[in-house]
C-alpha cells in the first residue's frame, strides 16, 4: 500500500526529471512541431493550380 509520503516522493522525482528536460528541450520544440506539421497537416495556404495559371478566357479584361 502506498502512503502519502510515497506519492509525494514520486511527484518530486518526476518534477526533478521532467522540469529540466522540458527546459532543455524548449528551443527544439518549435522545430519538432514544425516538422510534424509539415508531415501530417494539410497545406492551408497553397493555392490550387487553377488560380495560379488561368487561361486567357478566364482572366479579367484590363481597363
Swiss-Prot record:
Pfam families assigned to the protein according to its UniProt record, in alphabetical order: CBP_BcsF
Keyword Membrane assigned: yes
Q: Name one GO biological process term.
A: cellulose biosynthetic process
- Deletion phenotype: When the bcsEFG operon is disrupted in a cellulose-synthesizing strain (a strain K12 / W3110 derivative called AR3110 with a restored, functional bcsQ gene), cellulose is no longer made.
Main localisation: membrane
Instruction: List the transmembrane segments.
Output: 4-24
Gene Ontology terms, cellular component aspect? Answer: plasma membrane
Domain of life per record: Bacteria
Give the residues annotated as coiled coil: none
The membrane-topology field of this record reads:
Single-pass membrane protein
List localization entries. Answer: Cell inner membrane
- Keyword DNA repair present in the record's keywords: the answer is no
Q: What protein family is recorded?
A: Belongs to the BcsF family.
Q: What else is known?
A: Cellulose production is abolished in E.coli K12 / MG1655 and W3110 due to a premature stop codon in bcsQ.
Q: Which NCBIfam families match?
A: cellullose_BcsF
What is this protein's name? Answer: Cellulose biosynthesis protein BcsF
Amino acid at each position: 500500500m502506498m502512503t502519502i509520503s510515497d506519492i509525494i516522493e514520486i511527484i518530486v522525482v518526476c518534477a526533478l526529471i521532467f522540469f529540466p528536460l522540458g527546459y532543455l528541450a524548449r528551443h527544439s520544440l518549435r522545430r519538432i512541431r514544425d516538422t510534424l506539421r509539415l508531415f501530417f497537416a494539410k497545406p492551408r495556404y497553397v493555392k490550387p493550380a487553377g488560380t495560379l495559371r488561368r487561361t486567357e478566357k478566364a482572366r479579367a479584361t484590363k481597363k
